[in-house]
């Protein structure tokens, strides 16, 4: 099974960038009109806008369960500094547990696998940029892997 939210991620990034440009342009218009209070309010709105985007941690996610391995590639769609590309890959037999935690409209995936040194838990992966159907498909695929071990 293969799941990718590439199209949705591109749309999210495009919308974020266009909205950010509009906010900055409004701020520049207020600056040109010498409306200092409006410039400060616009700067505050922009800071809150960027802060919310960083808090949401919307990620591009590629999920694949073929060839007896689970492969998950992900990176933040909206990143101020630099993108950190991450990859998780493990054999189906190594999967010990997984949890999809939903809170405040966001979903995070946590995976635990068996290694030579014991059980290791990967950092949470934000699934907030995926649709409910895609999250459900990932959950079903991982549940099936757990059953078939």
Language-model features, listed with the residues they occupy:
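N-terminal membrane-targeting/pre-transmembrane regions
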Residues: 1-35
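Inter-domain helical "communication" segments and dimerization helices
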Residues: 2, 9-12, 42-43, 73-77, ...
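Single-pass alpha-helical transmembrane signal-anchor segments
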Residues: 24, 42-55
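Short, aromatic-rich membrane-interface segments at the entry and exit
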Residues: 35-43
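Conserved beta-hairpin
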Residues: 52-89
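Phosphoinositide-dependent membrane-docking surfaces
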Residues: 85-103
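Short acidic, Gly/Pro-enriched loop/turn segments at secondary-structure junctions
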Residues: 101-112
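A membrane-cytosol interface segment of integral membrane proteins
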Residues: 111-149
């Amino acid at each position: 099974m293969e799941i990718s939210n590439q199209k949705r991620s591109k749309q999210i990034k495009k919308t974020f960038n266009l909205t950010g440009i509009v906010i900055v342009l409004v701020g520049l218009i207020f600056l040109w009109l010498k409306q200092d209070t409006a410039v400060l309010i616009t700067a505050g709105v922009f800071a809150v806008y960027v802060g919310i985007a960083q808090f949401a941690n919307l990620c591009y996610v590629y999920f694949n369960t073929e060839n007896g391995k689970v492969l998950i590639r992900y990176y933040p769609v909206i990143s101020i500094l630099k993108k950190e590309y991450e990859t998780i890959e493990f054999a189906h037999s190594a999967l010990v547990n997984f949890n999809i935690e939903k809170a405040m409209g966001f979903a995070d995936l946590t995976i635990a696998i068996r290694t030579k040194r014991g059980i290791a838990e990967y950092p949470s992966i934000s699934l907030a940029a995926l649709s409910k159907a895609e999250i459900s498909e990932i959950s079903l695929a991982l549940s099936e892997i757990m059953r078939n071990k």
